[in-house]
C-alpha cells in the first residue's frame, strides 16, 4: 500500500547551502522531517549548481519520510543575474532597470524549458521576455 502524504512544502533555497536554520527548520521540523537528512540530500543533489536559488517541493509522508523534487531557478533570478542588477525596476513601464540580450533570453529559456508551459523554444522565449519587461528590463538584439 502507498504511503499517505501528510504535506507538500515549497521552499526556495540556495543550492548546496541548506541548513536546519530558517527557512528549512520551521517549515520541515513541524512536519517531523529529519532536518539533517534533508539538508545532506538537498546539498548533495544541488552541489553542482552553487550560487543559484533552487525551488524545491518536499513531499512529507505519514511515517515522517520524505521525497523532494528540485525545479529550475526562477526566471526573475536568472534575468537579474544576466542583467547584473540586484532588483528589478520600481516602475517597470517607466524606469529601465537594465538590459538583456535576445541571446541571454534564449539561454534562460533553454534552461527553464522543462518548467515552462511552452511547446517550443520561441514560446518559452516570449514568456521570459514578458517576465523581463515586467521587471523593467529592456530586451535588446
Swiss-Prot record:
PROSITE patterns: RIBOSOMAL_L11 (PS00359)
InterPro entries assigned: Ribosomal_uL11, Ribosomal_uL11_bac-typ, Ribosomal_uL11_C, Ribosomal_uL11_C_sf, Ribosomal_uL11_CS, Ribosomal_uL11_N, Ribosomal_uL11_N_sf
Protein keywords: Methylation, Ribonucleoprotein, Ribosomal protein, RNA-binding, rRNA-binding
Example of a GO MF term: structural constituent of ribosome
GO cellular component, one term: cytosolic large ribosomal subunit
Modification after translation: One or more lysine residues are methylated.
GO biological process: translation
Summary of subunit composition and partner proteins: Part of the ribosomal stalk of the 50S ribosomal subunit. Interacts with L10 and the large rRNA to form the base of the stalk. L10 forms an elongated spine to which L12 dimers bind in a sequential fashion forming a multimeric L10(L12)X complex.
Family: Belongs to the universal ribosomal protein uL11 family.
Job of this protein: Forms part of the ribosomal stalk which helps the ribosome interact with GTP-bound translation factors.
Protein name from the UniProt record: Large ribosomal subunit protein uL11
Source species of the chain: Fervidobacterium nodosum (strain ATCC 35602 / DSM 5306 / Rt17-B1)
Gene encoding the protein: rplK
Amino acid at each position: 500500500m502507498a504511503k499517505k502524504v501528510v504535506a507538500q512544502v515549497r521552499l526556495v533555497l540556495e543550492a548546496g547551502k541548506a541548513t536546519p536554520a530558517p527557512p528549512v527548520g520551521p517549515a520541515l521540523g513541524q512536519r517531523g522531517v529529519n532536518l539533517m537528512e534533508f539538508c545532506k540530500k538537498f546539498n548533495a543533489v544541488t552541489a553542482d549548481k552553487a550560487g543559484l536559488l533552487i525551488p524545491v517541493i518536499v513531499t512529507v509522508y505519514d511515517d515522517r519520510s520524505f521525497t523532494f523534487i528540485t525545479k529550475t531557478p526562477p526566471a526573475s533570478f536568472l534575468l537579474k543575474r544576466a542583467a547584473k542588477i540586484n532588483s528589478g525596476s520600481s516602475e517597470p513601464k517607466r524606469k529601465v532597470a537594465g538590459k538583456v540580450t535576445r541571446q541571454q533570453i534564449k539561454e534562460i529559456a533553454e534552461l527553464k524549458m522543462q518548467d515552462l508551459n511552452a511547446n517550443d523554444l520561441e514560446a518559452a522565449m516570449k514568456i521570459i521576455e514578458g517576465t523581463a519587461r515586467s521587471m523593467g528590463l529592456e530586451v535588446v538584439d
